């Protein structure tokens, strides 16, 4: 897909003004998921972002990162590692904190989900402030693995999440200005 074709993906993403708060435009990917053509195009574009690298596993962030990460892992015949909110995984885990607007939250993965030296791709639907993605990268590094790329469908460029992730190779498919 070229630039204009990538912009075509935007037609599948519904913009919801003033949600969850006044002045915010929510970029709703569920409308993209409801379109076989849109969903396929989005996953295909994510796959293209990985053609030039070798990797062992795909890490997907709860919850919408699962929706894009799992098909990418399947297509590339790689393992899929779910990043969950703290307390949702049944076996031994490692965790990492990240900042919320008012407080902190934690995400975790199983300690046996990655091996030392594994090369990992992180997939999510959206880069906003970058906090959750940064926490996911820390989980990978705690287990001695390496983040080789981060791929997201949407980037909210005005929130400058990419700055928090500057030590990583970050790719986004479509960009939006504003919050």
Place the predicted regions along the sequence by residue.
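Short, glycine/charge-rich flexible loops or terminal/linker lids adjacent to PRPP-binding catalytic cores
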Residues: 79-121
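Active-site-facing substrate-recognition patch
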Residues: 2-55
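Conserved acidic residues
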Residues: 56, 118, 148
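Conserved PRPP/pyrophosphate-binding segment of the phosphoribosyltransferase/PRPP-pathway fold
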Residues: 44-97
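Conserved SAM/SAH-binding loop-helix junction
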Residues: 67, 131, 135
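Generic enzyme active-site microenvironment
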Residues: 60, 122-123
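PRPP-dependent phosphoribosyltransferase catalytic core
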Residues: 5, 11, 135-179
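Conserved G/P- and acidic residue-centered "switch" motifs that form tight phosphate/ATP-binding loops
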Residues: 125, 130
């Amino acid at each position: 897909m070229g630039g204009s074709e990538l912009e075509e993906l935007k037609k599948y993403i519904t913009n919801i003004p003033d949600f969850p708060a006044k002045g915010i435009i929510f970029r709703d990917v569920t409308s993209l998921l409801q379109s076989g053509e849109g969903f396929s195009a989005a996953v295909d574009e994510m796959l293209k972002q990985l053609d030039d690298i070798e990797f062992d596993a795909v890490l997907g962030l709860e919850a919408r990162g699962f929706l894009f990460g799992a098909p990418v892992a399947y297509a590339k015949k790689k393992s899929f590692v779910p990043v969950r909110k703290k307390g949702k995984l049944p076996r031994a885990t490692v965790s990492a904190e990240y900042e919320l607007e008012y407080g902190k939250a934690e995400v975790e993965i199983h300690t046996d989900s990655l091996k030392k030296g594994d090369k990992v791709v992180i997939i999510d639907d959206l880069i906003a402030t970058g906090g959750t993605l940064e926490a996911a990268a820390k989980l990978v590094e705690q287990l001695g693995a390496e983040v080789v790329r981060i791929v997201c469908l949407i980037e909210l460029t005005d929130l400058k999440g990419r700055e928090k992730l500057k030590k990583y190779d970050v790719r986004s498919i479509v960009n939006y200005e504003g919050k």
